[in-house]
Amino acid sequence: MIGAMAWILDLDGVVWRGDQPIAGSAEAIARLRASGEDVGFVTNFSYSPVETVEAKLAGFGIEARGAVSTSAQAAAGLLEPGERALLVAGPGVRQALEQRGVEVVADGDADAVVVGWHPEFTYDRMAAAMRAVGHGARLVATNDDATLPTPDGALPGGGAILASIERATGVTAVVAGKPYPPSVAALWARYGREGTMVGDRPDTDGRFAVALGYRWALVLSGVATSAEVDPPPDVVAPTLADLVAAYGP
């Protein structure tokens, strides 16, 4: 048994794959909660508003209101209320910024440029970001994931968009999502210093677990297909359901 005060779950590859739930995930989460464990969800996918993520989980029979943490929220936390942000990202980032009290602008001078994955990213948006950074705006990113997993294979992720802006501006962004310090601080504030991080991507979830000081539980239902990864996991299971059955309460 893993004696953890909190179980933090990545979503894609752990709870669902694309638009389909991974078998047994809802039941595993229900078992954890019935045993008094605190379950939270953390995702680097910044495009969708939190309510959309919560609704998707609810559609799979998983109650998640108030339990979802996104890289959009972490990025918004790097700005102060009243600041101006030039948005190069999706509606989830806009919502997080506006809830923070940040003014979102489409062009012109800004205190920060906030970059996240967006399927309609264009040269014009890159140029607007470049101009704003050239005029002194900070460069903030939700995440630097190079790829985005889809049922049809990997596609360019938010990190690919970010790389183009970093190259154009010569500025390295402050990255907010997993496994970087802003998300670490947010998770510590919410769940404390003891827990288990469950994920399928060693480069983000594994490194995040190490940064948090949490146990690193790797499931092989997503990106990783072997336990031979870096950082090495504390425990490995085929799915979340198998993990909870073997190591849970």
What feature does the model see in each segment?
Residues 1-27, 31-37, 46-69, 73-249:
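Asp-based, Mg2+/Mn2+-dependent phosphohydrolase catalytic module
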